[in-house]
């Protein structure tokens, strides 16, 4: 939703200021919080849509990434943490949303939408993307992502205390050349230093 605050739970988009609708997995209807969320959306005239044919709540992780120009980038969603739960993997996003009027490009890289932080002319991801694409060199992965998303890839170290390897739990884009990061000083100062070094 254009100019709305970022809503992380179950959204399609990753670049919130360039979007005009908030999308949720249809699974959200089974949660008690949905009534309150829907009330807020309707009260504020925020357009929203429930996505059918999803296999898990976290639409942000498997739905295509929206670029600032309104086009979409689809990727291979097959994370290591769901290998024992294949029934939870939404692999055909075209069943969830009508992309016929949208340009959608397929990216031959295994990744999660939760590991993608669009930050102006840059995209921030953890190095989990490298471990999930061991058949490709870092250079090839970097080139493919940068070409598809149209911006420079910044790779930060993965916080191994979090099995998903998602950058969205570590950093938040605020404005050009400014991000917020988790307060790692008390729990992992070496990781904090590595993150700051990667972001500079």
Regions found by a protein language model. Give the residues of each.
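The feature marks the mature, well-folded catalytic cores of soluble enzymes
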Residues: 2-200
């Amino acid at each position: 939703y254009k100019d709305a605050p970022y809503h992380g739970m179950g959204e399609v988009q990753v670049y919130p200021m360039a979007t005009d609708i908030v999308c949720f997995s249809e699974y959200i209807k089974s949660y008690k919080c949905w009534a309150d969320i829907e009330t807020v959306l309707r009260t504020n005239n925020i357009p929203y849509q429930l996505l059918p044919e999803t296999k898990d709540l976290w639409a942000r992780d498997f739905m295509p990434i929206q670029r600032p120009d309104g086009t979409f980038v689809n990727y291979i969603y097959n994370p290591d943490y769901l290998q024992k739960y294949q029934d939870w993997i939404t692999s055909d996003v075209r069943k969830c949303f009508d992309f016929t009027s949208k340009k959608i490009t397929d990216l031959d890289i295994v990744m999660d939408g939760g590991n993608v932080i669009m930050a102006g002319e840059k995209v921030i991801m953890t190095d989990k993307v490298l471990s999930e694409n061991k058949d490709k060199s870092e250079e090839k992965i970097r080139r493919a992502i940068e070409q598809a998303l149209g911006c420079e890839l910044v790779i930060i170290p993965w916080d191994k205390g979090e099995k998903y390897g998602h950058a969205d739990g570590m950093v938040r884009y605020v404005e050009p050349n400014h991000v917020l990061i988790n307060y790692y000083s008390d729990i992992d100062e070496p990781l904090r230093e590595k993150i700051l070094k990667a972001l500079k």
